[in-house]
Structures are given as structure tokens and as C-alpha cells.
């Protein structure tokens, strides 16, 4: 089991690693080194306060000084302000140690090592000592392997530690993911990249901003071996590289991005260069591509590029349709570009905000073109055996978490609310020792009420990685004048997507009592102080986590988002109720009369009350969709004065890469919006992956209600016979689902239509499919036709727990595909990948197939019902 390691519990390791290391140069390219030195000097001059560069006062060998300068020149400001220089020096020495001790260390080119091994940061996670911890766990497992096989082995190790589960958008640190034993795809891929880099293997996180064929996105990993990049699904080990459940969806992708630390001079197409990273497009590793000369920005912006002086820019993308959005000086224009069919597109900038109009168009994604590497049966069997053992290792660790029974026993012992304590302790998973220790300190009835209120204010993910000193700090929050605002807007430590810190004690120590009292009496004085003393550098923290409030205070420099978190944190520390609005991102002071917007550029109280109007949208229900979902079916964006779309966020609950509210919850009865111009985008996803979008431009007028229609476009002729399937095919019912003797689908289902699904076990695509089906439980039960869900073998069927997917229709029966139903579907429907699961069909007992889906598909339940209701 992973040892518990707090943020700086690596002091002993640090002392060892800080021993002098001899020193060749870290950067041997003289021209590149000069560029780094220039960028480092600029960065140092930009940050004169806070003694942030004290580590350079040490007597360091050339290699370490150059490596530190490289990191400090380009790392996000959060990594400079929130972590001591010794932390970064420790990781430099750990990286060098891995390069010296691993057999492939000397084969890694200098530039590949510099950009894809040395940096600790992968995305926007909190940094921790994972590099040191993981190396000690992994070194003996991989040191005798080839680089190719070591990549596979590290992924098996990651599977021992974590599996996929959706969660909110804040990215857990690698050690927190291990402690929790699960994570969303962005956290799994962060874990794998961190683990690979810990043993000196170059790795990078790759993501598609938006799948072209389905309403979701994904992140995975590329690792470098022997001169080329391979891809793999994080914590989802396969027998070979370049194989994952997402092969097929990736082959339909439009763009694949990765952010490379620092100034990168590789061969890939550069999307953008920032002071912190170089964003590159690696789509050519996955799909046939085409180039076009465009400026691109869409409703889920997949790319943003700047034109040259002639108004032109090129982009490489998969061969599908993309909406091109061009803006300049407040005007904008847009058009559809079919990549591969047209190489140039001229977009006329002839529209301005405030013009009401509606436009419909069709989007077709790239065709599937995945090239799967061969896997022989022996390889698959061995991989399955290993995965089963890894599941048992991880489950043994998970068994140490508090259960409902043990949590209730704990609650009884300390005279706590059993129901509430159990829910919170079980949700905290591997962090239960922190939450239970905090609860045990709650002795009086008042402290129990306050402590449990605090634990309910923070997010589910916070429960899994919050530190005890943070909870204690915020329990000591000062009372505000209005008790109704205290719990949510003063004591609550969570402001936005930052890592929680004990900032209230910090501000109590650094802000004088007189100043604190003055700010509480007149909060606009605090607004003025922040506006005057915190300098905004828009690009200082790109690619990083938000700077902590303590880090902003120390540096007196921040990006706007970190400044906003800083202000709200400082306000709450002085009993001033404040928040960042989750929808608009605005900073607001909270009063008994409502929210007052904060404008750091114009600090006048009367200017803060922006006029609002109201938006109401009617909706005429279409088949299978009573209540459209935000993000999946529609979005709202504000049209800015620059002619760009600013997406409004309406997030709800834990959902990978964002899950939102619905039409009924948001627009049926209306919602308040600032006055201005807006865009409503709706999109109907077709079974084949295409989209039927509609864009509605409208305005919100102060004090008035704007009424529009939310229309989900339909295509009545979509359902047709697309293949054949033998309804006499046999399967073996799972014990308890109709006996264990083989039955035909006709026997099991009777005459008429039925659904057949071939499932994998504990894989993200299957889990998504089952959750999507559960969401349509009532409609599928009302339809009344059987759904036969089969597993490839008895072992997987035995391990499947339907209780893990509450709400599945009662019309489901489970079984084992003992007679090759999956193979028949693949062959008859001419599917390209015999092993890609899940597979779903709707067929009838006349052997006609009217629907097929393979692999990763968001909204499967909806697609099934759309087909059913059009039969």
C-alpha cells in the first residue's frame, strides 16, 4: 500500500538528493541555452517580491543551475510562488538519478528529456512528491525491461493503483489519485505521465478538446520509445502499445493537442506559443488529415489561432466538418469548413452583436479509420490475468476504507450524527483518517454542527484530499454580520477550482487588525487595495493550477483568476461574504439584498450593480428527449465586445470533463442574465456520429424578459435497416438470469425488437454506456422489449455487479457470449474492430438490424430511445 506522504514529508529523501551531483551541462545547445537565460532573466525581473528565487543563492553545479533556470523560466507562476526552490531542485536530482540508473537513460535525446521527463507538472494538478515516491516503487519492476515493455509495465502498476470514475474538473495530484484509488481520465493520465517520468521515460498527456462524433472529450498518454511516440490508455493496460478503447473514436477526431513545457522546437504543428508552454497538434498520429487556411473558434472551441498580416492561418485537422468562427474589433463571421474537401475558406466578417438571427447546418465527423495492432490470444489471456490480479491488489487497499458499518461505529463512539458521518467518511475513501481525526475533535454540540456544515460545503473531491490543518483553519472563521451568509460565503474554504489551503490563519497573521476591521466595515476598500497592489499578468500562470491566496500575497502578481480567488479568500478571512459566481465567473460581494459585482478596473460601488434581464426558452419535446441537458444538448454563450463567444458554465455534480443542468432547471421558468448579446447552440446527435446544430442569436434587455425557442432538430428518415443478425443465435444466461442452459435470443426475447449488448468489465466505454442506459430506465421499461447484455466470458460475467449501476432497466437479462454473437455482429455489420467493446444493436426476430454502436459513445440511452421511438 502506498505510504501516506503529505506535501513536504519528503525531507529525508530531499536531504539525500540535495547531496552534490557533479556536473555536465543540462543544455548543450548554446543558442537554446542563451534563449532560456534570457527568458529566465525576464521572469526574475517580473517577480521582484517574495524572495521567490532564493534557491539560486545556493552553490549549484552547472547542470542543476541550468535545469532550475529552465524550469523557472517557463513554469506557471503557481509553481514558483507555492513551492520552495528546494522542491524543484529535489525533482531535478530525482530525474537525473533515474536517467543514470535506468538502462534507457543515456538513449533519451536531450531535448526529449528536457521537455518530457524533467517537468513535474503534467496539467493543472497540485504538485507533490510523486516523482520520488513512484521511483522507489517502480525502479525494480522496470530496470530489466526494454523501454517499450517498461511503458507497458508502468501502466500495469497504475492499474493497481487507480481505475476510472467520473469526478469534477479540479485535477487531483498523482498521490491523491493513488490514495483515492480512482480518478477521471484527466487524473488517470496525469498519474501515468507522472509515473513514466519518474523512471525517466518521456511522456505527455494528449487530449481531444471535443470528440467529433460524440458529446464528450478525453485525455490519454503518449510515451516515447526508441525514436517514436506511442499512445496508451492510462490505467487501462493492454498487451501492446498503440491500443486502447479509444482507437476508433480517436480515428474520428478533428484535433489532438498536447501542451509541451517551455519553448519546444519539435517537428509537430504548433498551435500556439505562450510564456509557459508550446501547444502542439498531434492529430496526424491518429487520423488521415487535411490542411486548410482558417481562423478557428467554435462553440466548444477546439482550436484558436491568430492570423498573419494577410489575414490567413492554417490548421491541420481530421477529415470532417468544423465550424469556423472569425472575429476582429467586435465584428465576427462564421462558416462550415469540410476538411479534406476544401483547402481554403473565406469567411466574411459582417456580423455585429445585437443582430437576432437563427442558422441551421449539419456537421459530419471524420469516418472511422483506426488501425489496430495485432494481439494474439496468448497475449490477451496474459493481460487479462494480470489485470485481474491488479484488481485484487487495488481492491485489497480499498477494503481498508471506512464502510457504512465502521463509519457508524465511529460515529456512535464520538456521539455524532450516524447518517451524516457515515456518508462523509465513506465518501472520503483513502482520506478517511483525516476526516475521522477532524470529526473526533468536534466535542461540543456547536462545534459538531459547525464541523459537519463545513464538511458539507466542500466538494466530494475535497473530502478525498483535504488536509486536516485546512479544516481546522476554516473552523476558526470569523463570524459575519449576517448569519445567513456565514456558512456558504465566509466559513466555506472552497472558492473555485483551487487546492484548499489554511488561508484564514495566514491572513489573520499578515493583515493588521485595524486594516481587517476597516475592510469589513467598507468592503470596497479591500477591492481598491487588491486592484492597487496585485499586478495582473495575463500569461504568467498558463497551464498551471490557480495560485494559492498565500502565493498571490507573496508574489503580488497573479493571473486574473488567481487574483479573484485571492480576493474572495481574503474577504472571507475578514468576515466579508464573497464568492465567484459559478455561471459567469464574476467576483461578487454577498449581501442580504443579493450579489454585488466587483470590478477591479473601476472601483465604484454604484458601478457594480449591472442591469439584468431574463431569458425564458420554450421547448417542444421530441422523441426520447423530454428535458435537454446542458453541454450535451445545448449551451449558452455571451457574445463579447471582441466578437468572441464566452461559454456560460452551468455545472452540476461529478461528471467527467463537465456535467450540466437541464432545460427545465435553467430555462423553462427563466434565468437572470446580464444585459447583452448571447448565443444559444443546440445539437442533435445522430446514431452515425453526425450532428444537427442550430445557432440562435438573441439579446437580453435590462428589466425585460426575452423569450426564445430551444429546438432540437430531427431527421425523421434516420432509422433504416442497416444489416442482418441471426436471432436464433445462442447465449448462456448468467446464473440467476434464466438458468444456465443455452438459449436463443428468439427464445429469450420473443417476437419483435430487442437490444443486444456485448460488454467489457470495468472499462470506461462500458461504464458510460450502462450509466446512459440507466438514465432512460423508465422509457426503456415502458417500451417493454428485452435487453440482453452479454460478457465475453464467464469470469467477467461473475465479477460484474449490477448494483454499481443503480437504475438499470428491469428488462435486462445478463449472460455470456459462448457462441460468438460478438463476432457475428462484427462480421455482419462490417465493424472494423472485433475487440472494441461495448457493442450494441437493435434488431428484430426477422433478423433485421436497425441500430449499431461500437466502442465509446456518449448518450447511448438517448440514441437507443430515438431509434425505438422511430420504429
Task: Tell me what each language-model feature is.
Residues 298-317, 337, 642-667:
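Short, acidic Ser/Thr/Gly-rich low-complexity loop/linker segments typical of extracellular
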Residues 836-871:
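Thiol-/selenol-based redox modules, centered on thioredoxin-like
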Residues 802-837:
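Short, internal strand/loop/helix patches
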Residues 330-354, 685-713:
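Structured interaction patches on ligand/partner-binding surfaces of diverse proteins
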Residues 745-773, 786-790:
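Short active-site neighborhood of thiol/selenol oxidoreductases, capturing the structured segment around
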Amino acid at each position: 500500500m502506498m505510504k501516506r506522504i503529505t506535501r513536504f514529508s519528503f525531507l529525508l529523501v530531499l536531504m539525500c538528493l540535495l547531496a552534490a551531483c557533479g556536473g555536465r551541462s543540462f543544455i548543450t545547445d548554446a543558442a537554446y541555452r542563451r534563449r532560456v537565460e534570457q527568458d529566465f532573466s525576464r521572469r526574475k525581473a517580473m517577480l521582484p517580491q517574495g524572495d521567490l528565487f532564493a534557491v539560486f543563492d545556493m552553490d549549484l553545479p552547472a547542470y542543476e543551475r541550468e535545469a532550475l533556470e529552465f524550469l523557472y523560466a517557463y513554469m506557471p507562476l503557481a509553481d514558483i510562488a507555492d513551492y520552495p526552490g528546494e522542491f524543484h531542485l529535489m525533482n531535478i536530482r530525482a530525474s537525473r538519478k533515474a536517467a543514470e540508473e535506468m538502462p534507457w537513460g543515456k538513449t533519451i535525446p536531450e531535448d526529449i528529456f528536457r521537455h518530457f521527463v524533467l517537468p513535474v507538472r503534467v496539467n493543472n494538478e497540485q504538485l507533490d512528491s510523486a516523482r520520488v515516491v513512484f521511483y522507489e516503487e517502480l525502479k525494480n519492476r522496470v530496470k530489466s525491461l526494454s523501454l517499450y515493455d517498461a511503458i507497458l509495465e508502468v501502466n500495469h502498476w497504475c492499474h493497481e493503483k487507480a481505475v476510472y470514475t467520473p469526478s469534477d474538473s479540479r485535477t487531483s495530484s498523482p498521490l491523491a489519485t493513488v490514495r483515492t484509488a480512482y480518478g477521471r481520465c484527466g487524473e488517470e493520465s496525469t498519474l501515468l505521465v507522472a509515473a513514466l517520468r519518474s523512471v525517466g521515460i518521456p511522456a505527455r498527456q494528449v487530449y481531444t478538446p471535443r470528440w467529433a462524433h460524440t458529446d464528450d472529450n478525453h485525455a490519454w498518454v503518449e510515451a516515447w520509445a526508441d525514436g517514436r511516440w506511442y499512445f496508451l490508455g492510462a490505467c487501462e493496460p493492454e498487451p501492446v502499445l498503440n491500443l486502447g478503447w479509444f482507437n476508433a473514436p480517436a480515428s474520428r477526431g478533428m484535433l489532438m493537442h498536447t501542451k509541451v513545457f517551455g519553448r519546444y522546437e519539435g517537428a509537430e504543428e504548433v498551435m500556439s506559443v505562450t510564456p509557459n508552454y508550446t501547444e502542439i497538434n498531434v492529430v496526424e498520429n491518429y487520423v488521415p488529415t487535411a490542411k486548410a487556411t482558417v481562423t478557428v473558434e467554435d462553440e466548444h472551441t477546439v482550436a484558436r489561432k491568430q492570423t498573419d498580416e494577410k489575414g490567413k492561418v492554417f490548421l491541420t485537422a481530421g477529415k470532417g466538418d468544423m465550424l469556423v468562427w472569425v472575429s476582429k474589433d467586435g465584428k465576427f463571421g462564421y462558416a462550415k469548413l469540410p476538411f479534406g474537401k476544401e483547402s481554403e475558406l473565406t469567411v466574411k466578417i459582417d456580423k455585429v452583436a445585437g443582430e437576432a438571427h437563427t442558422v441551421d447546418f449539419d456537421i459530419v465527423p471524420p469516418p472511422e479509420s483506426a488501425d489496430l495492432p495485432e494481439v494474439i490470444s496468448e497475449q490477451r489471456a496474459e493481460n487479462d490475468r494480470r489485470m485481474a490480479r491488479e484488481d485484487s491488489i487495488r481492491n485489497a487497499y480499498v477494503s481498508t476504507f471506512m464502510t457504512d458499518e465502521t463509519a457508524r461505529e465511529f460515529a456512535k463512539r464520538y456521539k455524532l450524527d450516524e447518517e451524516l458521518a457515515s456518508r462523509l467518511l465513506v465518501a472520503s475513501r483513502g482520506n478517511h483518517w483525516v476526516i475521522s481525526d477532524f470529526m473526533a475533535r468536534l466535542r461540543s454540540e456547536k462545534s459538531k454542527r459547525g464541523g459537519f456544515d463545513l464538511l458539507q460545503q466542500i466538494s466530494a473531491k475535497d473530502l478525498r484530499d483535504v488536509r486536516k490543518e485546512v479544516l481546522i483553519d476554516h473552523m476558526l472563521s470569523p463570524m459575519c454580520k449576517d448569519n445567513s451568509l456565514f456558512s456558504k460565503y465566509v466559513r466555506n474554504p472552497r472558492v473555485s477550482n483551487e487546492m484548499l489551503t489554511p488561508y484564514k490563519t495566514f491572513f489573520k497573521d499578515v493583515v493588521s487588525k485595524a486594516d481587517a476591521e476597516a475592510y469589513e466595515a467598507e468592503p470596497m476598500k479591500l477591492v481598491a487595495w487588491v486592484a492597487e497592489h496585485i499586478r495582473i499578468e495575463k500569461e504568467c500562470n498558463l497551464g498551471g493550477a490557480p495560485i494559492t491566496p498565500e502565493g498571490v500575497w507573496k508574489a503580488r502578481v497573479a493571473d486574473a483568476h488567481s487574483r479573484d480567488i485571492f480576493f474572495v479568500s481574503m474577504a472571507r478571512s475578514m468576515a466579508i461574504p464573497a464568492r465567484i459566481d459559478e455561471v459567469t465567473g464574476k467576483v461578487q460581494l454577498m449581501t442580504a439584498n443579493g450579489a454585488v459585482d466587483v470590478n477591479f478596473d473601476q472601483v465604484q460601488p454604484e458601478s457594480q450593480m449591472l442591469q439584468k434581464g431574463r431569458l425564458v426558452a420554450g421547448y417542444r419535446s421530441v422523441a426520447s428527449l423530454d428535458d435537454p441537458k446542458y453541454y450535451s444538448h445545448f449551451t449558452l454563450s455571451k457574445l463579447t465586445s471582441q466578437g468572441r463567444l464566452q461559454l456560460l458554465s452551468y455545472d452540476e455534480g461529478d461528471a467527467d470533463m463537465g456535467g450540466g443542468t437541464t432545460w427545465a432547471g435553467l430555462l423553462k421558468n427563466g434565468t437572470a442574465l446580464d444585459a447583452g448579446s448571447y448565443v444559444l447552440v443546440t445539437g442533435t446527435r445522430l446514431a452515425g456520429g453526425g450532428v444537427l446544430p442550430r445557432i440562435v442569436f438573441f439579446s437580453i434587455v435590462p428589466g425585460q424578459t426575452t423569450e426564445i425557442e430551444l429546438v432540437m432538430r430531427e431527421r425523421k428518415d434516420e432509422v433504416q435497416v442497416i444489416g442482418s443478425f441471426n436471432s436464433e443465435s445462442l447465449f448462456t444466461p448468467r446464473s440467476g438470469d434464466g438458468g444456465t442452459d443455452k438459449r436463443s435470443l428468439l427464445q429469450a426475447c420473443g417476437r419483435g425488437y430487442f437490444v443486444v449488448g456485448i460488454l467489457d468489465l470495468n472499462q470506461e466505454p462500458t461504464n458510460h454506456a450502462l450509466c446512459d442506459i440507466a438514465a432512460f430506465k423508465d422509457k426503456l421499461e415502458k417500451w417493454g422489449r428485452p435487453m440482453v447484455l452479454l460478457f465475453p466470458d464467464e469470469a467477467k460475467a461473475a465479477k460484474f455487479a449490477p448494483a454499481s449501476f443503480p437504475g438499470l432497466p428491469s428488462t435486462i437479462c445478463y449472460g455470456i457470449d459462448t457462441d460468438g454473437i460478438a463476432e457475428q455482429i462484427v462480421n455482419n455489420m462490417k465493424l472494423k474492430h472485433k475487440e472494441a467493446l461495448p457493442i450494441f444493436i437493435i434488431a428484430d426476430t426477422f433478423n433485421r438490424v436497425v441500430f449499431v454502436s461500437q466502442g465509446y459513445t456518449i448518450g447511448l440511452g438517448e440514441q437507443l430511445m430515438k431509434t425505438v421511438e422511430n420504429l
